[in-house]
Amino acid sequence: MQTLRKILEQAEANAVAIGHFNISDLVTLKAVFEAARDLNAPVVVGTSEGERQFIGVRQVAAMVKSLREEYDFPIFLNADHTHSLLSAIEAAKAGFDWIVFDVSTLPFEENVRQTKAAVETLKALRPDILVEGEIGDIGSGSEIHDAAPDLRKGLTTPAEAKQFVDETGVDTLAPAVGNMHGMLKSMVAGNTKKRLDIERIRAVKAEARIFMTLHGASGTDDDDLREAIAAGMTVVHINTEVRLAWRRGLDSALAKQPDEIVPYKVLPQAVDSVKQVVAARLALFSTGRRARPAVQ
């Protein structure tokens, strides 16, 4: 089976993106895996520190490994938004394929210093592991928000992206380009969409020349996602849309079967609801547009 790095290289060459979907339990993992397998699309599942605390670090690593080995399918595991080196080391030792080391709330120079140290430590522990760094401000919480925070001052510049990549040695970069964690109530209702700064993505990519990840993509305009991928995004993170689909599927199942107490008779509708969202996103991410600056 191809390595995660090789799969990212192929996505980069074809100007398509790999889908990354956060999971919290077996229901969401099952849905993401089935959708990806149906489409024969490589996929990454991610768990934040909170999600890992609930599902278990070693437990989620074992589940993903079992799917990959039993079905010989390229599903990979990411330790999403890991805020401490100890937590990153725990995930690396458990067998995670990728670590998002996120200390982006710190001043830039301190972010560089800590991320560089994390890269060195994690690569010494597991030379094959991928490490991502984050710069800029994209808010916090894959939840439903009443209003959008003002993130304009936290947008990533091409110059700082290049400096960050050069000084830290990260494998992938998560910039702030108009993206935002979570969704607004108006987005959930279908009345508004997130819009991205496509020219900023293109400019950051041209300077950093590295795999780039779009975090906080739930609720983003479809055309903007296509353009963002064409401009240089190699990975796209979806979490809030997965959570919404899980809740809607579960609510629908319980409404139809109010007296049902058997989990395996209720949960399949939540699986199907999440699966539909994941399949639609994977199909969108796999549509290439045009050539973009290569990763060196």
Q: What are these regions, as identified by a protein language model?
A:
Residues 214-216:
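Thr-Gly-centered strand-to-loop micro-motif
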Residues 2-10, 14, 26-51, 57-76, ...:
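Alpha/beta enzyme core
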Residues 17, 103, 262-266:
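Short amphipathic alpha-helical segments at helix-loop
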Residues 221-296:
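C-terminal alpha-helical cap/extension of soluble enzyme domains
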